[in-house]
UniProtKB/Swiss-Prot annotation:
Regulation of activity: Inhibited by both FK506 and rapamycin.
Subcellular location: Endoplasmic reticulum
Keywords for this protein: Endoplasmic reticulum, Isomerase, Rotamase, Signal
Function description: PPIases accelerate the folding of proteins. It catalyzes the cis-trans isomerization of proline imidic peptide bonds in oligopeptides.
PPIase FKBP-type domain location: 45-134
Gene Ontology MF terms: peptidyl-prolyl cis-trans isomerase activity
Similarity remark: Belongs to the FKBP-type PPIase family. FKBP2 subfamily.
Designated name of the protein: FK506-binding protein 2
Length: 141
């Protein structure tokens, strides 16, 4: 004989597993700091200057950091110059804003990884700070 409470508990447990799996597949954007004034936000086509530190989600080991080189990283947002998780996760950022991006493997380096530093199927975590937007005219900033 089935007990309604046991059935409900089993359904809730199954639902929680499904939701946990879904969240692991999606880009997670955590806003760590936003300046009080934000006259301009990043958009596709912008040339961004960033500081970042990248770690593996599974063990927290650092694989890269612009801070270690004391040299910001520059790229064009939305141009495919970086992993998809960055192109998506850095949209609508303010200058000086800091974010934590948790990027599932399919939006990072996928099944191949980036040997020898990033294993296949790795979820990546990036602490990022937008230092500047290089290509905007003064009146747009």
């Amino acid at each position: 004989m089935y007990h309604p409470k046991a059935l409900i508990i089993a359904l809730l447990f199954t639902l929680s597993l499904i939701l946990a799996a879904k969240s692991a597949e999606q880009l997670q954007i955590g806003v760590k700091y936003v300046p009080e004034e934000c006259p301009v936000k990043s958009r596709k086509g912008d040339r961004l200057s960033m500081h970042y530190t990248g770690t593996l989600a599974k063990d927290g080991s650092k694989f890269d950091s612009s801070l270690d080189r004391n040299r910001p990283f520059e790229f064009t947002l939305g141009a495919g110059q970086v992993i998809k998780g960055w192109d998506q996760g850095l949209l609508d950022m303010c200058i000086s804003e800091k974010r934590k991006l948790t990027i599932p493997s399919h939006l990072a380096y996928g099944e191949r990884g980036h040997p020898p530093v990033i294993p296949p199927q790795s979820t990546l975590v990036f602490e990022v700070e937008l230092l500047g937007i290089k290509n905007r005219h003064v009146d747009e900033l």
